[in-house]
Amino acid sequence: MTVRLPDSLLVLERGWLSANNILFFDGDDATLVDSGYVTHAAQTVDLVGHALRGRRLARLINTHSHSDHIGGNAALQAKFGCEIVVPAGLHASVAEWDENALLLSPLGQQAARFQHDSLIGAGDRLAMGGLEWQALAVPGHDMEALAYYNP
């Protein structure tokens, strides 16, 4: 069985042990899910900029706070002026930039500090790529992690 992704969704495959980035297109705007490592931030900005093809990166949504998912946030926000949305349980950790709570310092990881604009929680719904998605709590790998499900 072959699965075909919608044309409004583009997966930017990254290297081993790095989070893939997923772009959702909605007319002239786009949403990116996760941003990769801080050490790959310049490459991420270039890849996203090329993939946008003139669209505006309006929003960046993080699934959780590991460094391979939030590392490029600051660079993308600086370049594109996008809104950053984080899981609701990360509000204080990101706002105060608590590197222990974000699991950066304990794991010897890095991420450039960024400011988030809004929160998303389990059960919330959002539109991406012309489809409706529901945020699902998926604690385990990260206790605040969210996955997005298209019912």
Residue ranges and their predicted role:
Residues 39-42, 49-128:
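Active-site HxH/HxHxD metal-binding segment of metal-dependent hydrolases
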Residues 1-55, 147-151:
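Conserved beta-strand hairpin/beta-sheet module of binuclear metal-dependent hydrolase folds
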